[in-house]
Amino acid sequence: MEILWKTLTWILSLIMASSEFHSDHRLSYSSQEEFLTYLEHYQLTIPIRVDQNGAFLSFTVKNDKHSRRRRSMDPIDPQQAVSKLFFKLSAYGKHFHLNLTLNTDFVSKHFTVEYWGKDGPQWKHDFLDNCHYTGYLQDQRSTTKVALSNCVGLHGVIATEDEEYFIEPLKNTTEDSKHFSYENGHPHVIYKKSALQQRHLYDHSHCGVSDFTRSGKPWWLNDTSTVSYSLPINNTHIHHRQKRSVSIERFVETLVVADKMMVGYHGRKDIEHYILSVMNIVAKLYRDSSLGNVVNIIVARLIVLTEDQPNLEINHHADKSLDSFCKWQKSILSHQSDGNTIPENGIAHHDNAVLITRYDICTYKNKPCGTLGLASVAGMCEPERSCSINEDIGLGSAFTIAHEIGHNFGMNHDGIGNSCGTKGHEAAKLMAAHITANTNPFSWSACSRDYITSFLDSGRGTCLDNEPPKRDFLYPAVAPGQVYDADEQCRFQYGATSRQCKYGEVCRELWCLSKSNRCVTNSIPAAEGTLCQTGNIEKGWCYQGDCVPFGTWPQSIDGGWGPWSLWGECSRTCGGGVSSSLRHCDSPAPSGGGKYCLGERKRYRSCNTDPCPLGSRDFREKQCADFDNMPFRGKYYNWKPYTGGGVKPCALNCLAEGYNFYTERAPAVIDGTQCNADSLDICINGECKHVGCDNILGSDAREDRCRVCGGDGSTCDAIEGFFNDSLPRGGYMEVVQIPRGSVHIEVREVAMSKNYIALKSEGDDYYINGAWTIDWPRKFDVAGTAFHYKRPTDEPESLEALGPTSENLIVMVLLQEQNLGIRYKFNVPITRTGSGDNEVGFTWNHQPWSECSATCAGGVQRQEVVCKRLDDNSIVQNNYCDPDSKPPENQRACNTEPCPPEWFIGDWLECSKTCDGGMRTRAVLCIRKIGPSEEETLDYSGCLTHRPVEKEPCNNQSCPPQWVALDWSECTPKCGPGFKHRIVLCKSSDLSKTFPAAQCPEESKPPVRIRCSLGRCPPPRWVTGDWGQCSAQCGLGQQMRTVQCLSYTGQASSDCLETVRPPSMQQCESKCDSTPISNTEECKDVNKVAYCPLVLKFKFCSRAYFRQMCCKTCQGH
C-alpha cells in the first residue's frame, strides 16, 4: 500500500499538470461516460470540506487559489494555498475523513516537460501547481495513505488496509465546468481498484512494429558502443579532484528526449507517464548496491518532439543518429546553470542525454536490424559525448538505457577484456554483450563495478559532484509491473494485438505473441511487480528475476563499512614506500534497494621511509631498466628516466639511451615513486600525493628555511651577496665559498653573457664547467645534493641546489667578457640557544601565483598561503602563525584561449575475427580543446600532422581445426519414431583440409544422430495376392489367392480387422470345348475339375455337361 500511494502521488501530479492538453486522463476513452461503462461498479458521492473534528465548513472542494506559475515569476509562496485540508465523503458503506497536507517538495523547480515542433519549443509545463496533497484517514494514520489533488475537484486515491479507492469529479456535460455551481456540492465518482477491468487502456498503438525473435543477439539483441573520444586525463582540469578510492554520492542530471515516432506510438496523453516509468527503472538499477557506488539518475528535463527538428536527424542508422543527437543536445545544453541554482531561463542543466526512439535502429547502415542501443564509451561529463540513443521496446528499454549509460561511465561488456561472464567466473549481468535467459539484468558485475569506480576515481566524473537543491523527480516506489501488466508489456514491444503467451518463468523471460501469431521472446524479464505463479506460490509477483509472494518486498537495508583490512606489503624496501588497507561495504551489505556506503574505501600510509643505502639504484631508473629486455617497435633499447617537461610526473616516461626520443612505457609508476627528484611527494595510483617533510603521506609538516622539518628557521643564517668585481677576461675567478651544510643555494647571473658559472671543491676538483670545458645544462650530483645547472637560450644561466652540502664548495666564474654581475644566496647552519620564537615574529603571506595548470583551454593559478618569518621572509611550519587570521587561498583563471588542434586516437575495437586474419578499427578525430571539460570536433584538415591509421589487420594466426557437419540424411523409417544421421568431419578453418577427429575438441563435436518422426505410421492392412487358375477347364470351377495381414514394414501382423478381410476363394468358369467325347474313349473325370464330388452330392450328374466332365464319378447314377 505504501508503494501504491507513492506512485499515485506521482501519477496524480503528472495528470493534473498535463491538463492543458487533455482534461480526461483515461487514455483511450473519449469521455468519462464511456469510461464508466467499463467499470464493473462505481458510486457517486458529494465530498465536503470539514475541520479537524469533522464539522462541516463548505461544499467547495476545488482549490480556487491554485495557479500555474512560470519560473520567471517569484517562487511559489506556500501560504497562497492552504497547507492543511480536511474532507469528508461516504461510499461503499464507509465514511472517509481525510487529513491532507500540501506537498511542496514533489519535484524540483528544475524539472520541465517541453513539447517541440519544427520551430523549437512550443509549450512546456513545470509542475508548480499548488494543489497536490498527501495524507491519511483521520484516526487511521498508520494503516492508510491518501494522495489527492484539488486543482479541479478531488482527484486521486485513498488506500486502506483492504482496498484502494479512486475518486474524481463527475464531469458536467451540460455546462462549462468553469461555471459549474458548487452551492449544493459537486458530485464525484468513486470506484475501487478492483472495479477496473483487465483490458488494454491505450488505443494509440497505430504505428506497427516488426516481429523479431532475436534470441542470442548482442545486448538487448544488439548493442554497440563507440570508442571513447575523451582526451587523456591530465592536470588541465580546473576542478579539484576528489581523493582517490573515496565513495561519494553522484548526481546524473539527465535530459530525456522522445522522438515523434514515440509520440505517434504512445500518444501525447501517455508519453510522459510512460517515459518516466522507464526512467524510474533506470534510476533503480543505478541505486543497486552491486554498482559499488552511489549514483542517482535524476530526470532534469524531458523533451517530447512532435515534429522533426532542423538540426537533428533520426533514422534507422544508429551511428549517424547518435552523432546528430549528441551535437543537437549539446547545442541546447543550458550553460546558465551549474546544477545548484535555477537558471534565469528556467531550463535545467544536464550532464547526460538519452534519446528514446521507435525507429528500428541499426549500426553502420540505414536499415532495421537487431541493434537496440549505441553510446560513447567513457563520454560522461564531456558535453558532446555524454549521450546515447535507445530503441523503445517497452519497459525493457530501461535495461538498454542503463546499459548505454554504463558505457558512458567507461564500462565495457562483461567478458570483453575482462573475466566476468567467462567460464569459471561470475555470470554476465547488466553489461552482458549477449542477453540470454540466464543473464541477470537487475544487478552489476564486479567488472562493471571496477570500471565505474576507476572512471569516477580518476576525476572524469566531476560534473556529477554537484547536488541539485532538490531531487528533480520523485520516482514512484510502485513496481512497474503493477502499472503495466504482462499483456501491456507485450503490446509495448509487439503492437496492439500482442499478449502474453507463456506463463511459466515470466520473471526470467516474457513470452509474447508476435504479429505473425508466433510465441516469441527477447529474453527480457517481465517488469518487477508483474503477476506470476509457481508450484509453491499461488499468487506472486516478480522481484529481480524471481517470483516471490505477492506484496512482499525485501526490507531496504543501507550498507555499512566493515573493518579495515591489515596493512598490505610496502611497495618499497627503502626510500619511502606505500602500504594500503581496504574495507568493504558489508557490515551489513546493502540489500533491498539500500544505499551503498559513502566514504573512503582504500587508505594509504607511508612505510619504509629510511633512506636507501648509498649507491642504491634510483627507483624510477630501475623501473625504466626493466624494459631493456622488451622490444620496442622491433628493437631493444637501454632506457633511462626522462625528466624533462611536458609529461605526467607519475607516468613512467623513459628516454632511449643514445637516441633522441622518449616514450611512456607505463601509464603509472610503482606506488611510492617520487614525483620528482626535488620533492618528497610520491605517486599513488598514477597521481602525485603530498608527503610532508616528516615522510608521512598527507602530512602538513613543512621544512623551514634551514631544511629543518617543522622548524622555525632559527638554526641557520641567510647569506646573500652580489659579485660584480671587474676582473680580467680569459680565466676562472672565485665568486663565493659555500660552507658545508648550506641549503637553498641559488647562484644566478643578472644578465645574459658569454661567461660561465663553475663549481669546484676546496681541492680544486671541478664538478661543473671545469678545465675550460663547458658542460651541457643538466642535473649534477655533487656534495651529497643535486645541483641544477640551467643555461636557457633567452635567460641568464643559473645554478641551484636544495642542500645540505656534505663538503665545502667554491663557486667560480669563467670570464669570456666583462663581468655583468652574479647574485648568490644560501643559508648556512649556526649554533643558537633556544628556538628563536622570542626573537622574531611570524605572519601569513600569499605565495607568488603558481604556474597555470593548463597551457590552453582554461587553467587555474593559485596563491598558496604560507607562514613566514618576519625577519627574512622565509617559510616555516604553519603552526607558528595564528590559524584564526589565516587568509583564504587565491585562485584565478589563466590561458583561456583554445588549444591547437590535435588528433584524438580512440582505443582499438574488437577484431572482426578471432583468427585467420581480421580487421580492427578505432576512432581518429581532429579535436580542439576549447574549455577545461569541453572540446570541439574539426575537419581532418584542421590537424596539421599525419593522420593516424584507423584500421589495421589483426589476429593473423591460423584458426584451429573445427568440426564441420554435413547435411542430415532423411528420417528412417519413413513414419513413426526414427533417426536422422549425418557425417561430422574435423576440418581446417578454410575447409580445405580434413584432420583426424582427435585434433578437434570432443566436447564441442556436433551430434551425428538425432531423433525424428515423419508422422504416425499407417495401421496394418490386408494384402491380397493374384487369383490362381480356375479349377475347371470347362464350365464352373474355383479360384484361390493369398490373403495376408501385413504392417507398413511388410511384416506379418494379427491386428487387421476380420470383418474387412477380403475373400481368398471365388467361383470361376472356363469355356468348354463343343466337340463330344467318342464312346470309345475311357470314362474318367477330367483332371482339372476338382468339384466332381460336389456334382454327385448335389445331383448334377443328370446334366449332360457335368456328366461328361465327371464321367467316372457319375457312372451308375
Swiss-Prot record:
Record remark: domains: The spacer domain and the TSP type-1 domains are important for a tight interaction with the extracellular matrix.
GO biological process, one term: kidney development
PTM statement from Swiss-Prot or TrEMBL: The precursor is cleaved by a furin endopeptidase.
Cofactor(s) listed: Zn(2+)
Residues with attached carbohydrate: 99, 172, 222, 234, 724, 956
Chain spans, region Spacer: 717-843
Reported induction: Isoform 1 and isoform 2 expressions are up-regulated by TNF in retinal pigment epithelial cells.
CDD domains: ZnMc_ADAMTS_like
Keywords: Cleavage on pair of basic residues, Disulfide bond, Extracellular matrix, Glycoprotein, Hydrolase, Metal-binding, Metalloprotease, Protease, Repeat, Secreted, Signal, Zinc, Zymogen
One family name in Pfam for this protein: PLAC
Protein's UniProt name: A disintegrin and metalloproteinase with thrombospondin motifs 6
Active site: residue positions: 404
Gene Ontology terms: cellular component: extracellular matrix; extracellular region
Ranges where the PLAC domain occurs: 1079-1117
